Design a protein with these regions (language model features):
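Core AdoMet radical
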Residues: 29-44, 51-72, 77-142, 151-158, ...
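Canonical Radical SAM [4Fe-4S] cluster-binding loop centered on the CxxxCxxC motif
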Residues: 7-43
């Protein structure tokens, strides 16, 4: 469908502050052992300028879930990026928000939103998240995003604690019904400062099989080869691409902050995972017969469009 094109997205991890306490995540609210940070608007724009110079035409702003009082600042940041880079796509991955906040981000210039549901089985969801978090609200957020007009991404964590094959089948069927433009998935990786520290990581082969299933079921979807794959195995990203992924997201975040955005242990953020390593990434992809595309790669009307 895409020939040998792999789309690149510049990832900017804007904050590791989070109001949630998900049992699997290293930036959960109750983790007192990490230094919290939040990028100022000027720092985010600086990352975008560097990314644009390197050839990125999509920026992904990802961060822990912030309280509603921060929404106004995000609206201003999105508007500033849109004004400075009118030819670029802006993707947000900021968790669950009010419908009004999603609408304001969209009107300010955001095009895409990533919100992985992680699992659509109610019982399993409650084994991964504290009682105050709600699967039904998360799924409602996905519906809002679609109704507003975003290109929407959702997805799963493979091999999370207590996950069964039946849960994965439910996820496959949910994603088939929802028809997202983007499908994000990666293996569960434990973090030492979480309740799931002693659980084993998700299985690489199962992750790759699921990636291939999603590619066959959703031929036009944008599916990233995730950092988690590259963390699990040195050739994880290449194997993800060979299994059907068509997006990679090198890290544009300020290098001195990257280690603090520690969702799981030993997270890959250097070498080809970093934006500075774009040449290395291009070499690695060339080695398996693929090339980096600097096009935006928008998904419109059920088709992927690759011209700017």
């Amino acid at each position: 469908r895409f020939g040998n094109k792999i789309f690149i997205r510049g990832l900017i991890e804007i904050t590791n502050r989070c109001r949630n306490n998900c049992y699997y995540c290293g930036i959960r609210k109750e983790n007192r052992n990490i230094v919290r940070y939040e990028l100022a608007q000027e720092e985010i724009l600086s990352c975008c300028h560097e990314g644009y110079r390197l050839g990125f035409r999509t920026f992904v702003l990802q961060g822990g879930e912030a309280p509603a009082v921060k929404d106004e600042g995000m609206v201003e940041t999105v508007a500033a990026i849109r004004q400075s880079f009118p030819d670029c796509a802006i993707t947000l991955s900021l968790g669950e928000k009010s419908r009004e906040a999603y609408e304001r981000f969209f009107l300010a210039g955001a095009n895409r939103y990533l919100l992985r549901h992680e699992t659509c089985n109610e019982g399993h969801y409650h084994r991964l998240h504290p009682a105050e978090m709600s699967l039904s609200h998360r799924l409602r957020c996905l519906d809002w995003l679609k109704e507003i007009g975003y290109q929407v991404g959702t997805g799963i964590m493979v091999g999370s604690p207590y996950q069964t094959v039946d849960h994965l089948v439910e996820d496959i069927l949910f994603i088939e019904r929802f028809q997202p433009e983007m499908i994000g998935m990666g293996p569960f990786l434990p973090h030492h400062d979480t309740p799931f520290a002693s659980f084993p990581p998700g299985d690489m082969e199962l992750t790759l099989k699921l990636l291939s299933i999603f590619r066959l079921m959703h031929p036009a979807a944008l599916i990233p080869a995730t950092t988690a794959l590259a963390t699990l195995a040195p050739d994880g990203r290449e194997r993800g691409i060979l299994a059907g992924a068509n997006v990679v997201m090198p890290n544009l975040s300020p290098s001195h902050q990257r280690a603090k955005y520690s969702l799981y242990d030993n997270k890959a953020s250097a070498g080809a995972e970093a934006a500075e390593g774009l040449l290395k990434l291009e070499e690695q992809l060339k080695g398996i017969g693929y090339e980096v595309s600097r096009e935006r790669g928008d998904y419109e009307n059920g088709e992927l469009t690759v011209d700017n």
